[in-house]
Amino acid sequence: MGDSHVDTGATSTEAVAEEVSLFSMTDMILLSVLVGFLTYFFLFRKKKEEIPEFTKISTTTSSVKESSFVEKMKKTGRNIIVFYGSQTGTAEEFANRLSKDAHRYGMRGMAADPEEYDLADLSSLPEIDNSLAVFCMATYGEGDPTDNAQDFYDWLQETDLDLSGVKYAVFGLGNKTYEHFNSMGKYVDQRLEQLGAQRIFELGLGDDDGNLEEDFITWREQFWPAVCEFFGVEATGEESSIRQYELVLHADTDPAKVYTGEMGRLKSYENQKPPFDAKNPFLAAVTTNRKLNQGTERHLMHLELDISDSKIRYESGDHVAVYPANDSNLVNQLGKILGADLDVVMSLKNLDEESNKKHPFPCPTTYRTALTYYLDITNPPRTNVLYELAQYASEPSEQEQLHKMASSSGEGKELYLTWVVEARRHILAILQDYPSLRPPIDHLCELLPRLQARYYSIASSSKVHPNSVHICAVVVEYETKSGRINKGVATSWLQAKDPAGENGRRALVPMFVRKSQFRLPFKSTTPVIMVGPGTGVAPFIGFIQERAWLQQQGKEVGETLLYYGCRRSDEDYLYREELAQFHKDGTLTQLNVAFSREQAQKVYVQHLLKRDQEHLWKLIHEDGAHIYVCGDARNMARDVQNTFCNIAAELGGMEHTQAVDYVKKLMTKGRYSLDVWS
């Protein structure tokens, strides 16, 4: 955010003042010029419009890169490399599918994590005949690259390397409900062209708010013919099932050498060592788990995780990620329907000995552990999984249906959309509905995607709660079109976490903190306008706690306004007592609550913003207020943004297009921040 630059400049100036006696007058003049230049550079340099600036996230991943992916490709006879920027595993999955496709065209592909290589090696790629670099790049949050693509993004911004002769294609993964739709994919595509690389197929833009799988299939089925035409090659055959991993059973393995749910280092949960991140989560004890709402229709909960002695540091506005576990009942049903012994110790070993990815998940382990902690068994499987599974259906009609849903035909796409996606059929439901489909459990484990961490906005301030992280979440449970009851993996698992523990064991949650740009202004006197209905209030609890703490430290604090929304005051008014107390003691200048179902005509937060438009416009236009919006991206965030545009147009005397630009400039300057999801 913009204020981080102001902070840096202010600190530098103070340091100069303290050291002034140590310099000559000439030194002082030169230093002043330098400070002035740096201040101008950081405060007024033009931001790139394609993708917003953001803070580099530090991780514990080794900074040592592989010597050369080009040399590795030469050594293994590959000519296509598919890089992926993936936060939830989907882009990595698409990259693996593309690299696997290559064999049909007499080519050999490899999927690669850009974090593991020096991308400057791209300039040497033309040394390989018919070489091609493909980039499956997801956009995370508000236009950010994924964590593993951060270094790649930084390199693209800084390099002037000549990439003439490099052939490339890009498929982006994004969500149209977000302001910066597919920013990373668009930026990579544009920047590679600027550096001289040759695009051989049009940029693909997948929309997760629509049907990301269909978007990818549509792009992919046009991509490969274009590759064949460009390089003058022909397809060698139909798509076929090729195992990537072989099953290895371990009869007498030492239990101490078997993974039991760890994400990275073996026994890391027994011997915890900081720093903690996605590959080394901290086991935090649940100290509080209480229901926030009064109604019985939904369960909204507040959890507190103990991070004492972890050395984990967080700031208000950051996200906490938790690794959940699948419902043991679902796991047992899968084992039963497949006739498998879930407690067999096994490994899935990559048949490609040169691959960096030796196993699809930590091995050796048991099927039970894999299905509980490592594999996603509750989301609808993608079409490539159905294609691979079809061979195991002994009933011809079931095999035909599976092949049809995995095809690129219009009828097949429609069937997949209605029968799998919209009906929310997970793998167990598909096995139940297709009685002849009984794949080997090891192949199923190879095909299923990894179970991903779930991210929540932290509902506390580290100034007030340095040793705990608070979570606010709604338990997900719904009936599908097929009449089944589906439950949210993480929220159902968290709901069952009893602070009292079980059988003398504490309730533990594997977690880590991901830094965010959703930050309070550097100056405490800056007014803040917070808009967060439902669980979108979570980060604002931390913001308000921090503003209260600043007041207690004797700091002057600017106006603090909250626009919160829920259904009814006696049903789902979250943190009601806490918010009332903050309002009473003056921390909250205004507490504005929209109850959508307490009157005939529904009232939402945007209606209250419109009601208060004169005061809000003064705070924004004259007093430099910062706006924060948290919650639903599809409807609420869009409606709130439109409301602020309308306020700017009406009270600022602007045309609609000018008002839209005005709000977008607030975003560019870090004065309009979003923490939204769809």
Curated annotation (Swiss-Prot):
All residue ranges annotated as the Flavodoxin-like domain in the record: 80-224
SUPFAM superfamilies found in the cross-reference section: Ferredoxin reductase-like, C-terminal NADP-linked domain, Flavoproteins, Riboflavin synthase domain-like
Annotated binding of FAD, by residue: R424, R454, Y455, Y456, S457, C472, A473, V474, Y478, G488, V489, A490, T491, W677
UniProt-annotated location(s): Endoplasmic reticulum membrane
One Pfam family hit: FAD_binding_1
Protein EC: 1.6.2.4
Residue sites binding FMN per the record: 86-91, 138-141, 173-182, 208
InterPro entries, per database record: CysJ-like_FAD-binding, FAD-bd_FR_type, Flavdoxin-like, Flavodoxin/NO_synth, Flavoprot_Pyr_Nucl_cyt_Rdtase, Flavoprotein-like_sf, FNR_nucleotide-bd, NADPH_Cyt_P450_Rdtase_alpha
Reactions it catalyzes: 2 oxidized [cytochrome P450] + NADPH = 2 reduced [cytochrome P450] + NADP(+) + H(+)
Organism whose genome encodes this protein: Cavia porcellus (Guinea pig)
Name of the coding gene: Por
The FAD-binding FR-type domain, residue ranges: 279-521
Protein name per Swiss-Prot or TrEMBL: NADPH--cytochrome P450 reductase
Gene Ontology annotations of biological process type: response to hormone
Source organism, top-level taxon: Eukaryota
Family: Belongs to the NADPH--cytochrome P450 reductase family. In the N-terminal section; belongs to the flavodoxin family.
Chief location category: endoplasmic reticulum
